[in-house]
């Protein structure tokens, strides 16, 4: 009898330890991405009517996110819910900027991203160190940000929206596709820009085809690439296909084998997405992602073409709040001054 009692005590102890381990794991995972407004309750009808837009607000370029938000909000009558993502030390500044500016009327939630989720998954060698910043990888973790919504828009912070965001949200995703992107070969005018500044628009520019792991993928190096700075995503498919886990796997492989090409600095976050989504994504209307405005300060699009564009993206080194840059007047018209006076434009006439 005493032996049986002792066995029961041991089993009870093991059960308690197991439950504590499970509880710790859940709590720890929940702190990687924390939503300040998780206590907000919304009816199913309200959630159906909302268009969730995820955008990151990094400390050194927070004015970019605010300009993007301003352009989206000002060009639509749709019910937008902005998920503004930042690191812990920037959250209060994000809130102050929104609540003490013309953006105070927007519907928003502030979300904390904890970089611990990226530990051991990023190689420190990049020609553009700014692309190694933690927030550059937020797009990999969308399901941990969005819990109630079936469909979500992700935008890089260096964009301006000139059209009604409802049109982008209405992008049709084919059955079995977790996301839609804009191909790098989809616009004649984009092709002209590619030639002028010597840009790559194929997988060759992002993956190192000298490596066996890349060759074994069976993807032609001449396959047209896409830019993940604008994403329309289906959260159900994303979770079903375990997209986040797949992306993390290819991040880890790159740490171990250095699989990404050094010819393009943007390959840090783009390359794993090109692998995971190869042949399995829908396409966005090309006018909803006019890009490469930040690649060369001497290369410009025509004014007529820019007026037709629904979304402008200054991907590249030359940002519209800095000098030199091109078409910065289009960006500056949406700039929201920093109430704290920290973020300033670096233009000769500013």
Swiss-Prot record:
Entry-listed glycosylation sites: 234
UniProt topological domain (Cytoplasmic) ranges: 1-6
InterPro entries per record: Glyco_trans_8, Glycosyltrans_8_dom-fam, Nucleotide-diphossugar_trans
Major place of residence: membrane
EC number(s) stated in the UniProt entry for this protein: 2.4.1.-
SUPFAM superfamilies: Nucleotide-diphospho-sugar transferases
TM region positions: 7-24
Membrane-topology annotation of the record: Single-pass type II membrane protein
Keywords carried by this UniProt record: Glycoprotein, Glycosyltransferase, Membrane, Signal-anchor, Transferase, Transmembrane, Transmembrane helix
Gene Ontology CC: one annotated term: membrane
GO molecular function per UniProt: UDP-glycosyltransferase activity
Localization in the cell: Membrane
GTP-binding in keyword set: no
Family the entry assigns: Belongs to the glycosyltransferase 8 family.
PANTHER family the record matches: GLYCOSYLTRANSFERASE 8 DOMAIN-CONTAINING PROTEIN, GLYCOSYLTRANSFERASE 8 DOMAIN-CONTAINING PROTEIN 2
Protein name: Glycosyltransferase 8 domain-containing protein 2
Organism in which the protein naturally occurs: Bos taurus
């Amino acid at each position: 009898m005493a032996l049986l009692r002792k066995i029961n005590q041991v089993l009870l102890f093991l059960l308690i330890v197991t439950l504590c381990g499970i509880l710790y794991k859940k709590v720890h995972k929940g702190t990687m991405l924390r939503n300040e407004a998780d206590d907000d309750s919304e009816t199913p009808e309200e959630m159906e009517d909302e268009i969730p837009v995820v955008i990151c607000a990094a400390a050194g370029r927070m004015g970019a996110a605010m300009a993007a938000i301003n352009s989206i909000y000002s060009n639509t009558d749709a019910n937008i819910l902005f998920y503004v993502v930042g690191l812990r030390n920037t959250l209060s500044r994000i809130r102050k900027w929104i609540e003490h500016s013309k953006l105070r009327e927007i519907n928003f939630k502030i979300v904390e991203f904890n970089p611990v989720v990226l530990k051991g998954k990023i190689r420190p060698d990049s020609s553009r160190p700014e692309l190694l910043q933690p927030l550059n990888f937020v797009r990999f973790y969308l399901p941990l940000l969005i819990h109630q919504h079936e469909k979500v828009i992700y935008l890089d912070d260096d964009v301006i929206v000139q059209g009604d965001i409802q049109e982008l949200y209405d992008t049709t995703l084919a059955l079995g596709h977790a996301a839609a992107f804009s191909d790098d070969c989809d616009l004649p005018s984009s092709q002209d820009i590619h030639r002028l500044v010597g840009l790559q628009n194929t997988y060759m520019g992002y993956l190192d085809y000298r490596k066996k792991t890349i060759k074994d993928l069976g993807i032609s190096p001449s396959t047209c690439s896409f830019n993940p700075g604008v994403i329309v995503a289906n959260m159900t498919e994303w979770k079903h296909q375990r997209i986040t886990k797949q992306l993390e796997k290819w991040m880890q492989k790159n740490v171990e084998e250095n699989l990404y090409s050094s010819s393009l600095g943007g390959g840090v976050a783009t390359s794993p997405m090109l692998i995971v989504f190869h042949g399995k994504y829908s396409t966005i209307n090309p006018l909803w992602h006019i890009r490469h405005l930040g690649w060369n300060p001497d290369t410009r699009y025509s004014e007529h073409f820019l007026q037709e564009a629904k979304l402008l993206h200054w991907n590249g080194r030359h940002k519209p709040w800095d000098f030199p840059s091109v078409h910065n007047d289009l960006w500056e018209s949406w700039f929201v001054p920093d109430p704290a006076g920290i973020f300033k434009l670096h233009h000769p006439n500013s």
